[in-house]
Amino acid sequence: MGEHSPDDNIIFFKGEEDDLTPHDKMLRFVDDNGLVPSSSGTVYDRTTVLIEQDPGTLEDDEDDGQCGEPLPFLVEGEEGFLIDQEAMSQGYVQHIISPDQIHLTINPGSTPMPRNIEGATLTLQSECPETKRKEVKRYQCTFEGCPRTYSTAGNLRTHQKTHRGEYTFVCNQEGCGKAFLTSYSLRIHVRVHTKEKPFECDVQGCEKAFNTLYRLKAHQRLHTGKTFNCESQGCSKYFTTLSDLRKHIRTHTGEKPFRCDHDGCGKAFAASHHLKTHVRTHTGERPFFCPSNGCEKTFSTQYSLKSHMKGHDNKGTAYSALPQHNGSEDTNHSLYLSELGLLSTDSELQENSSSTQDQDLSTISPAIIFESMFQNSDDPGIQDDPLQTAALIDSFNGDAESVIDVPPPAGNSASLSLPLVLQSGISEPPQPLLPATAPSAPPPAPSLGPGSQPAAFGSPPALLQPPEVPVPHSTQFAANHQEFLPHPQAPPQTIVPGLSVVAGAPASAATVASAVAAPAPPQSTTEPLPAMVQTLPLGANSVLTNNPTITITPTPNTAILQSSLVMGEQNLQWILNGATSSPQNQEQIQQASKVEQVYFATAVPVASGTGSSVQQIGLSVPVIIIKQEEACQCQCACRDSAKERAAGRRKGCSSPPPPEPNPQPPDGPSLQLPP
């Protein structure tokens, strides 16, 4: 092989004569163009220099292969480099060394050659006449510790700008501010804002279009079947780009070549963009700005910015009152929580609730409690939109007249919370409720299973006071998901004053009648509220595909629910799995969402089970919050390992045994799940 450059020595190869070899065809091509062929026909060396305009773009991980890879302009199936002259769009210079002469061929190609040769990229390819093996000179990055190589000097120069931080081309679109290494990359990025997609697929029946030729060619591999397939045993995945295949192979090998060089960190990643996102946790960089007027929030990832922008887009409907539904309309969308990202986390609720502990109970209004749950925190990445909060409070106050009037209780003696039941489908009859009996001793704390915190649904010592022991990771609901009773659209329940409804199943008519006939226990200082059962159908959800319902059963003397009650991720997961009975939806569950925090919010509008007017049940409506996992944004193969790890964690989850049912007094909260 021979490689010729100003710094290389000339290496000659002696080849045997062969009348049918591709280089003889090249000699005929040279002869047709007026050059004198060699008398012997023997070629010692053939070197081609490709002259191309510097593209100024560098696809991530697309050109980092090892030495010896063919260049993209080579014609598949051809043995010679320049046999098919029409397929060579770039200009080239070729010289052929023979025993008695040197042939020099200059072809400008079908695309214009650069006017200034200094702005061009010269790619050298050499072919051994004996073995017909071609070799492309690779350009090695000279920065210490960088193993990247490139087939063109232009791509190498672009890559080296990443080491120097030369992101000089900045997007001037409002609210963007992204910077790029080359002007070409900036032009491609602007098409994201303008929605321009000039490269359309020409396959009949396919209407897809793309903003770059690179993405179009990758898409067309799906039509031609020339994809990059994973050859690992048992893996049948395929990809449209070589870089995606390389990233996927790392999920099999466990290779993580991108390592954080900050002191004391040492974390490694399989993809370079994951490392870039991680480095921002050290530097505190937040390059993504919210473009909305009056919003000065910044974010470290584009995913976080998009999640935040949904709050601005849905500002008029995110927390507004429910739309008016006729009795015949579908009520699956009666629970509106379209923007879950703006709700406070459990730690924020504990911190914010302490500010209202010293207030007089008679002065605490629903709006004050609700506003305290949405107060802004110091972290700009998780701050809540004040306009969104104001709209939410207004929507609550707008329906305040429909809330049942509650006389203020004396002191802090009575503070109860709400049980919660998830039900789906129809398979078994509901279990009868235990009769309410008057207590002869102080009511014991409800039994919630091993490892649970008794403060989950117990009466707190003071109103709005968080529990002494945090419970974000405790087991709050101890039962197997198969034991949840399926529940049809329940008819409205009879309102019975002084009745304590036990969570687990709707109260039957016989149970209600027996409870009415029994004498009511003596009350202390407060007037009991009528207990009611409200069935809420959940909206359509990618996880809860069977539209399970939430049965909310307030107990008498209901007050304000503690804002720091948390259900563990493990326990909620089997609730979701139980609600999703279709086996074909398991893959959807694995990819759809991740339970990050579960806590109880207040003042959420709900709809009546009979389709009547919108009604709000005080301040004690429990809500399950499912936050979307912040996953990789790149649509790349590096997400495969994360899916496998998530599936492994779900297989290892085991639910604790169900607790024994215990009768509860009327004044105490009840949490009893069906056997």
UniProtKB/Swiss-Prot annotation:
Ubiquitously expressed. InterPro entries: Zinc_finger_trans_reg, Znf_C2H2_sf, Znf_C2H2_type. GO terms for biological process: cartilage homeostasis; cellular response to zinc ion; DNA-templated transcription; positive regulation of DNA-templated transcription; positive regulation of transcription by RNA polymerase II; response to cadmium ion; response to oxidative stress. Its main location: nucleus. The keyword Nucleus applies. The keyword Nucleus applies. A motif (Nuclear localization signal) lies at residues 132-137. Disulfide bonds: none annotated. The modification N-acetylglycine is found at residue 2. It holds the Pfam family zf-C2H2. GO terms for cellular component: cytoplasm; nucleoplasm; nucleus. One of its GO terms (molecular function) is DNA-binding transcription activator activity, RNA polymerase II-specific. Residues 427-464, 645-675 are annotated as: Disordered. Keywords: Acetylation, Activator, Cytoplasm, DNA-binding, Metal-binding, Nucleus, Phosphoprotein, Repeat, Transcription, Transcription regulation, Zinc, Zinc-finger. A zinc finger (C2H2-type) spans 139-163, 169-193, 199-223, 228-252, 258-282, 288-312. The modification Phosphoserine is found at residues 5, 304. Residues 655-675 have a biased composition (Pro residues). PROSITE patterns: ZINC_FINGER_C2H2_1, ZINC_FINGER_C2H2_2. Gene3D superfamilies: Classic Zinc Finger. It is found in: Nucleus; Cytoplasm. It comes from the Eukaryota. Zinc-dependent transcriptional regulator of cellular adaption to conditions of exposure to heavy metals. Binds to metal responsive elements (MRE) in promoters and activates the transcription of metallothionein genes like metallothionein-2/MT2A. Also regulates the expression of metalloproteases in response to intracellular zinc and functions as a catabolic regulator of cartilages. This is Metal regulatory transcription factor 1.
